[in-house]
């Protein structure tokens, strides 16, 4: 058996091929797993569990079917869907996890996270993240009428796209010191994360021992998952 990890699907109505690919994944590979972990940015945007978007209801039902089949499903918030709440988690049968979680998998201690907190060189983003994660600000935003939230979210996405266009790729990648610090804080030799859309397996030194950082790919033109078994940790790409 295997434990599966995915991230950065950025599901939205404008990308039906990705949605269809994810549904096939849920109906196939996911049903064979010991557990499924979604490490953030499942959706391109999330403005509240009360959004009646049919895509959200469709995804909740599909994930719930996996959970009901006996495969536990877990979710860590990303930078796009950090407002996904308990209502959607309940509807989809997912368990919400903290932003950093250590798993014991087949004899390995594995740290999982979305990955945006590792991009400490991007000071502008980290300042924005700290602001929008303030509970009082989230409560205020979620109390606004839905149409107002949609306008704010669209403007924020446009601003983010414009800001990122002028940033270097290095700034938007993880900071190596932040990676080592996180792994040593949790005393792990394995880290799995998403966010950067740069799939790879990196070797490093943490806790004065060889360590590995596995980065999930985004679901743009193909699927991406990490498959952890007793024998191996594999980064796998597959067609929709």
From Swiss-Prot:
The keyword Cytoplasm does not apply. Keywords: Cell inner membrane, Cell membrane, Hydrolase, Lipid A biosynthesis, Lipid biosynthesis, Lipid metabolism, Manganese, Membrane, Metal-binding. Gene3D superfamilies: 3.60.21.10. Its cofactor is Mn(2+). Pathway: Glycolipid biosynthesis; lipid IV(A) biosynthesis; lipid IV(A) from (3R)-3-hydroxytetradecanoyl-[acyl-carrier-protein] and UDP-N-acetyl-alpha-D-glucosamine: step 4/6. It is a peripheral membrane protein. It catalyses: UDP-2-N,3-O-bis[(3R)-3-hydroxytetradecanoyl]-alpha-D-glucosamine + H2O = 2-N,3-O-bis[(3R)-3-hydroxytetradecanoyl]-alpha-D-glucosaminyl 1-phosphate + UMP + 2 H(+). The keyword Nucleotide-binding does not apply. Its EC number is 3.6.1.54. Mn(2+) 2 binds at residues 41, 79, 114, 195. GO terms for molecular function: manganese ion binding; UDP-2,3-diacylglucosamine hydrolase activity. GO terms for biological process: lipid A biosynthetic process. Substrate binds at residues 79-80, 122, 160, 164, 167, 195. GO terms for cellular component: cytoplasm; extrinsic component of plasma membrane. It comes from the Bacteria. Signal peptide: none annotated. InterPro entries: Calcineurin-like_PHP_ApaH, LpxH-like, Metallo-depent_PP-like, UDP-diacylglucosamine_Hdrlase. Mn(2+) 1 binds at residues 8, 10, 41, 197. Hydrolyzes the pyrophosphate bond of UDP-2,3-diacylglucosamine to yield 2,3-diacylglucosamine 1-phosphate (lipid X) and UMP by catalyzing the attack of water at the alpha-P atom. Involved in the biosynthesis of lipid A, a phosphorylated glycolipid that anchors the lipopolysaccharide to the outer membrane of the cell. NCBIfam families: lipid_A_lpxH (TIGR01854), PRK05340.1 (NF003743). Belongs to the LpxH family. This is UDP-2,3-diacylglucosamine hydrolase. The gene is lpxH.
């Amino acid at each position: 058996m295997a434990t599966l990890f995915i991230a950065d699907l950025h599901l939205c109505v404008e990308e039906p091929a990705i949605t269809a690919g994810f549904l096939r994944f849920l109906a196939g590979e996911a049903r064979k797993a010991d557990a499924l972990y979604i490490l953030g940015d499942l959706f391109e945007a999330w403005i509240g569990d009360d959004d009646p978007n049919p895509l959200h209801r469709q995804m909740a039902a599909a994930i719930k079917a996996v959970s009901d089949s006996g495969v536990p499903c877990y979710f860590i918030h990303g930078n796009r869907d950090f407002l996904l709440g308990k209502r959607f988690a309940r509807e989809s049968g997912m368990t919400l996890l903290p932003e950093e979680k250590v798993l014991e998998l087949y004899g390995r201690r594995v740290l999982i996270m979305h990955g945006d907190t590792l991009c400490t060189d991007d000071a502008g983003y980290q300042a924005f993240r700290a602001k929008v994660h303030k509970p009082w600000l989230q409560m205020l935003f979620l109390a606004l009428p839905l149409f107002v939230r949609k306008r704010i979210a669209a403007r924020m996405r446009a601003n983010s796209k414009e800001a990122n266009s002028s940033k270097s790729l290095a700034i938007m990648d993880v900071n190596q010191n932040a990676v080592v610090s996180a792994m040593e804080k949790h005393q792990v030799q394995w880290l799995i994360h998403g966010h950067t859309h740069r799939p790879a397996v990196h070797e490093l030194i943490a806790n004065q021992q060889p360590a590995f950082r596995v980065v999930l790919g985004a679901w743009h033109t193909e699927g991406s998952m990490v498959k952890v078994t007793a024998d191996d940790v594999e980064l796998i790409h597959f067609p929709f």
